[in-house]
Amino acid sequence: MYLELHFQFLFRFFSLIPIPCTIPNFRYHTRLLISRNXVFMNKLKMALLVVFLVSLFACTTIHQPKETVKSRFLKNNRLNKISIINIYTT
């Protein structure tokens, strides 16, 4: 019952928002409007490509690969050996 009311509310809410047609209808357009629409679509594609590449670069630089357990163990083992050597030499 609650889910039905929830979906009805969402359906009514989103039906109030007009959704523009994304497929251009060129039947009633002049050549100027057709070329402007084609240029706008090309600019939109380029902008989306740039956003995709920037976000991909940001994701790869933010999340550096984690140090493996083996490398951590070897590093800790080396540090322990060095500290043991320092203890015995002093």
From Swiss-Prot:
Give a yes or no for keyword Membrane in this entry. Answer: yes
- Which keywords fit this entry according to its UniProt record? Membrane, Transmembrane, Transmembrane helix
Q: Where are the transmembrane segments?
A: 46-62
Superkingdom per UniProt: Bacteria
Subcellular compartments: Membrane
What is the protein's given name? Uncharacterized protein HI_1037.1
Listed GO cellular component terms? Answer: membrane
Q: Which organism is it from?
A: Haemophilus influenzae (strain ATCC 51907 / DSM 11121 / KW20 / Rd)
Task: Indicate how the chain sits in the lipid bilayer.
Answer: Single-pass membrane protein
